Amino acid sequence: AYIIQPNRKNYKAPNIVKILENEKITKIGHYLRYDVSGLEYFLKCNIQNIFDTKIASKLCRTYTQNHGLKDLVLEFCGKKLDKRLGSSDWNKSLSELTDAQLQYCSNDVIYLHKIKDDLLKMLVREKRLKLYESSIQFLKTRIKLDQSGFTEDIFQH
């Protein structure tokens, strides 16, 4: 796992943008709505080929209401994530973050490949892969709505 921090003065990160926009590289994350929105806004890019473990989990793990990353790591990897550092002050430079904060960041993503693989198998088994793919397309639309100032659900009555 890599921990990155773009230059806050101009947010130029051309090498990262190349990766984010590369359709051949899958970007895996958990609850990507705000991460993708922020990265696209600040880096002026269009992120391609994302896999959102929370959306996949909600579509294929219908036997539970627990779809947090902590729950997925426990079920698929047999590990307990310590989420206490999640509410830390993250508005610091990388050099100011503690070793515990840096470890927390890497722990948050190190299990995502296995979780993605297992969720993909479940989506196929449950015949929900196409529904997942449509949901990801809509996620991109939802992000565009967020970026345009429509923070409320426009489909809500």
PLM segments and residue spans:
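Conserved DEDDh/DEDDy metal-dependent 3′-5′ exonuclease domain
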Residues: 1-122
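Mixed-charge, glycine-rich, non-catalytic linkers/tails in nucleic-acid processing enzymes
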Residues: 91, 98-157
